[in-house]
Amino acid sequence: MPTLQSLAVPFGCVQGYAPGGIPAYSNKHESYFSGERSIDGNLFCGFKYQCVEFARRWLFERKSLVLPDVDWAVHIFNLKEVSDARTGKPVRCVAIRNGTAAKPVVDSLLIYPSDDYSPVGHVAAITEVGDKWVRIADQNHRFHKWDANYAAELPLIHEKGVWTILDPLEDEVLKPLGWVTFPDTPDRNPNEPLVLHESLHFKRGELPTLRRLTFTPTSREKDWLDLTNEAEAYFADVCGIDVKNPKLEKASYYQMNRELYLDCAKYGNQLHQMFLEATKFVLGSDELLRLFCIPEEYWPRLRHSWETQPHAITGRFDFAFDEDTQQFKCFEYNADSASTLLECGVIQQKWARSVGLDDGTTYSSGSLVSSRLQLAWEMAEVTGRVHFLIDNDDEEHYTALYVMQHASAAGLETKLCVLFDEFHFDENGVVVDSDGVAVTTVWKTWMWETAIADHQKARVQRGNDWRPTPKDEVRLCDILLGPNWDLRVFEPMWKIIPSNKAILPIIYNKHPDHPALLRASYELTVELQRTGYVRKPIVGRVGRNVTVTEASGDIAAKSDGDFSDRDMVYQELFRLPERDGYYAILGGWVIGDVYCGTGVREDKTIITGLESPFSALRVYQGAQRRPLTHEDLDKAEAAAVGGGLKT
């Protein structure tokens, strides 16, 4: 049976047309945020393809009205006026509560409340009203192809003189707050041209910024980590954090503004799709695949992985941003990595709160990571036990505990396995754990290249005729590269391709004008010599075996490591700006299929590595956003009645 996810219209494709021929576009799923502005002529509609984007386009085309900027969709219910698109003058609008004597009105906006899952609420257009139903058109709520000129027909209940709209959505029934009407404004004549007054034209706001800020906290929470949480407790033990220490010392953190946050999301989502497209391109060509130096015997299994295991959990881009030049660049995609995930999703927010930075004007750049991590597991279509395979490494340990926590929250059974003593072969040669449970799904921190090397080494040591018996020790390759090609692995084997830097010249050649890409080549070209270049191994980690050469030919930096025997690629030099003596790399997280968080690693050298410290990153938002619920409206109405009685 096809799932709702499999039936979803792809991002950016038309789901249907509302009355008047107004298109509604798919946002893919409700947790996806593209970071891309939608501008229709000179009208800023919103972000592709959120619910407000459709509502603003619909109101403009249907009534020649312009919805003002709102923080969240739910805040439309608080509006008292909108703008006449032709004159720019204010036009009255009226909010009517759901569940009152007023019957819903055609061509009004239906507003949904904040809830725990979606504090921003939702907005839809009411396109038709019957006695027992209303029909709505919207985006980012349902994702199917429309059968008619509306997205859904919702029940309208009329009891004891009260009209109530309900929205049965999958396994829950939502009750909208109410609807916003435009009583003084008839529908626009479709034969008349759309006109937008100059005062309503979109104007680009502030430029993107990234600052390193230093301050001395005025207070400090004593117990800022939760030592009852396994991941946080392990992190505290490893990093030597004294959570009882109230000492106030000078501290530093990074702060980006909303424009840079939007650039991270926009470029992160775009680049993720580019890397996926390039991966498909590479896997379809033996000539290109050979550039990745993967032994040919593994190619069929690699292609099988791509064809049968589309789901992924995490990947991290390395980004850089120069505020002076306003350039934003991607260095590479660590598509098979979860390193610094706990720091981004939990630690930086709890540290910020402990030193008083969480004052409502900023929020953590990793605030969505935990919820999206759980969602990624829910969407991965996994059943049974998930074995978490890690090396005997502290960072891998607390990272695995964090990811396990959210896999468990998604309803999965999990088991942490350090090295391979946990496993043995049963009588049939199947790898099972100490409970006798066969390994069918794995999350791992091991590099796929390590598994391939182990597989080749094992063949030499065991011989070609070896068959597993219960007395044999289980190795990494027996799990990841055993006879079961349908073993679910996160990250899947095909992630070798986007993680390999041999993909960088392919990406650049396919998208040479993309503003976030750097020129890359398999050979040192005259152009790269002119700009300066970075030489790095196609397979490597944490900045090892990297050489940075200036345009003058001088070597600016060089790192050692274990990857010097690998093939190399050459990438255009992008000079990291110095901030207070430090150089910062932005780690941009794609979780599931959506960009959702950013972290910072900084160093006093221009090559960041394993020992480069993680620093907190805050996003400046200005005034704090507040949810709006039925309870909030009830309290406001009660207060208004009470105030009236007192007078």
Swiss-Prot record:
Outcome reported for the amino acid change (mutating K604T): In strain: Silvio X10/7
Query: What would changing L283I do, according to UniProt?
Result: In allele TRS-2 and strain Silvio X10/7
**Subunit text:** Monomer.
Supply the gene name: TRS
Effect upon mutating R535K:
In allele TRS-2 and strain Silvio X10/7
Q: What does this protein do?
A: Bifunctional enzyme which catalyzes the formation of trypanothione (N(1),N(8)-bis(glutathionyl)spermidine) from glutathione and spermidine. Converts spermidine or glutathionylspermidine into trypanothione. Can also convert aminopropylcadaverine into glutothionylaminopropylcadaverine and homotrypanothione. Also has low amidase activity, hydrolyzing trypanothione, homotrypanothione or glutathionylspermidine to form glutathione and the corresponding polyamine.
Briefly describe activity regulation.
Subject to high-substrate inhibition by glutathione.
**pH behavior:** Optimum pH is 8.1 with spermidine as substrate. Optimum pH is 8.5 with glutathionylspermidine as substrate.
What is the designated name of this protein? Trypanothione synthetase
**PANTHER family registered for this protein in UniProt:** BIFUNCTIONAL GLUTATHIONYLSPERMIDINE SYNTHETASE/AMIDASE-RELATED (PTHR30094), SYNTHETASE, PUTATIVE-RELATED (PTHR30094:SF17)
Residues that bind ATP: R316, F317, D318, K501, K536, G543, Q571, I606, I607, T608
Query: Which residues are listed for Mg(2+) 1 binding in this entry?
Result: D318, E332
* An example Gene Ontology biological process: trypanothione biosynthetic process
Enzyme Commission code? 6.3.1.9
Describe the effect of S615I.
Answer: In allele TRS-2
Which positions are annotated as binding Mg(2+) 2? E332, N334
- Entry keywords, A to Z: ATP-binding, Ligase, Magnesium, Metal-binding, Multifunctional enzyme, Nucleotide-binding
Q: What is the effect of changing T218N?
A: In allele TRS-2 and strain Silvio X10/7
